[in-house]
């Protein structure tokens, strides 16, 4: 039905025909818009429903925070209640089921700060050496602007350009889709930029060549986010 790996989100899969192998997909939004939650939803659906091994590189959150995010979403428990432990009796049952599902899911998490692409490749190759499971089939990176090249650079735009170019090369070399989360510049918050705050390619932070290297750029946007401000 789909050329690539289904995300589990039907409308998105209809538009993208799944996540294409070798594709670099940028998922961009302002803070608080839900890009990490959305990316984790895709990752868990791919791993749990499609049984495709997923590598999640989180440069912002720890493995424990990632795990808690996934568990609360899978169990359908409010994240605030999950954090405070204010759970109902039935929540514990849902949480136990979610924990079992996550334990069995082929998800590899890494929370190395400021990771480079070279380090990322080495870690994925080590995971792929496990003969008992298939190779990693999807890579998720949260988020692009926290990555480094491992070399001193005074020009952040050039550094991000180098990172996105090499992420695209890595996607092709490993024949897997890479979803890289990206921040948007503050310009999108200004009414003068565009009255609805809807993001555009020009709003990609440190953009450089992000739009040239990416096979697809997805923006997350919610009217309700701005209506409540």
Spans of features found by a protein language model:
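Amphipathic alpha-helical transducer elements in NTP-driven molecular machines
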Residues: 6-9, 63-67, 89-99, 114-121, ...
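Conserved P-loop NTPase nucleotide-binding/switch module
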Residues: 69-78, 145-168, 190, 199
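N-terminal pre-Walker A segment at the start of P-loop NTPase domains
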Residues: 1-14
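Phosphate-binding/switch region of NTP-binding enzymes
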Residues: 13, 159-229
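Conserved nucleotide-binding/hydrolysis micro-motifs of P-loop NTPases
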Residues: 32, 61-64, 72-73, 87, ...
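P-loop NTPase nucleotide-binding module
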Residues: 9, 17-61, 118-130, 137-140, ...
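Cytosolic-facing regulatory segments adjacent to core modules
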Residues: 14, 41, 45-135, 149
């Amino acid at each position: 039905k789909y050329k690539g790996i289904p995300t589990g989100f039907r409308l998105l899969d209809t538009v993208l025909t799944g996540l294409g192998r070798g594709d670099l997909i940028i998922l961009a939004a302002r803070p608080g818009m839900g890009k990490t939650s959305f990316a984790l939803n895709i990752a868990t659906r791919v791993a749990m429903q499609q049984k495709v091994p997923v590598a999640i590189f989180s440069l912002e959150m720890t493995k424990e925070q990632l795990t808690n995010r996934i568990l609360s979403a899978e169990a359908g428990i409010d994240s605030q209640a999950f954090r405070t432990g204010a759970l109902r009796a039935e929540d514990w049952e849902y949480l136990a089921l979610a924990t079992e599902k996550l334990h069995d899911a082929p998800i590899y998490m890494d929370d190395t700060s400021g990771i480079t692409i070279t380090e990322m490749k080495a870690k994925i190759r080590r995971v792929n050496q496990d003969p008992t499971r298939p190779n990693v089939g999807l890579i998720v990176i949260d988020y692009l602007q926290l990555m480094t090249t491992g070399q001193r650079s005074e020009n952040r735009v050039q550094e991000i350009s180098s990172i996105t170019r090499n992420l695209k090369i890595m996607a092709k070399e490993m024949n897997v889709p890479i979803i890289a989360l990206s921040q948007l510049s503050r310009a999108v918050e200004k009414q003068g930029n565009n009255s609805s705050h809807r993001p555009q390619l020009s709003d990609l932070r440190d953009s450089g060549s992000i739009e040239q290297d990416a096979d697809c750029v997805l923006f997350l946007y919610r009217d309700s986010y701005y209506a409540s401000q």
